């Protein structure tokens, strides 16, 4: 591990210290390492350099919508090489939450997630992507 010295203006340092306290970091180094990892991951995504990833796709949908549950299940089965696990939660009488773990080429994972989120009666879809 390398030791470095950086200069940060007072306002930025105060904001960083607030974040450290709120998130419960042990020290500034841990917080800065996490921020650097997040920034590098985001840059890799934006530049298209992340070849493979793990994705967490979460979305809500109206389970009473005609054939939607069946259509979503078939989509997951048709992409069994990407969709590795799912958790289904009944939110209320009409709405369900699905959380799916996806693994594969980043472009394929994004395409799969976009397809699911675009289905009629699927709402609030979010994809979180992590590097492999």
From Swiss-Prot:
Name of the coding gene: nikR
GO molecular function term, any single one: nickel cation binding
Pfam families per the UniProt record, alphabetical: NikR_C, RHH_1
Protein name: Nickel-responsive regulator
Positions of Ni(2+) binding: 77, 88, 90, 96
This protein's UniProt keywords: DNA-binding, Metal-binding, Nickel, Repressor, Transcription, Transcription regulation
Family statement: Belongs to the transcriptional regulatory CopG/NikR family.
Superkingdom of origin: Bacteria
Gene3D superfamilies: ACT-like. Chain A, domain 2 (3.30.70.1150), Met repressor-like (1.10.1220.10)
Details of cofactor binding: Binds 1 nickel ion per subunit.
Cofactors that this protein relies on: Ni(2+)
Keyword RNA-binding: no
Subunit structure and binding partners: Homotetramer.
Annotated function: Transcriptional repressor of the nikABCDE operon. Is active in the presence of excessive concentrations of intracellular nickel.
Signal peptide positions on this chain: none
RNA-binding listed as a keyword: no
PANTHER family: NICKEL-RESPONSIVE REGULATOR (PTHR34719:SF2)
GO BP terms: response to nickel cation
């Amino acid at each position: 591990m390398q030791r470095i010295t950086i200069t940060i203006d007072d306002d930025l340092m105060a904001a960083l210290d607030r974040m450290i306290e709120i998130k419960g970091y042990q020290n500034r180094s841990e917080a800065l390492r996490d921020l650097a990892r997040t920034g590098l991951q985001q840059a890799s995504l934006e530049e298209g350099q992340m070849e493979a990833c793990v994705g967490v796709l979460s979305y809500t949908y109206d389970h009473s919508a005609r054939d939607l549950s069946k259509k979503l299940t078939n989509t997951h089965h048709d992409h069994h090489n990407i969709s590795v696990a799912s958790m289904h939660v009944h939110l209320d009488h009409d709405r369900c939450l699905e959380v799916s773990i996806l693994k594969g080429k980043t472009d394929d994972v994004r395409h799969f997630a976009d397809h699911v989120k675009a289905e009629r009666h699927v709402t609030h879809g979010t994809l979180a992507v992590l590097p492999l």
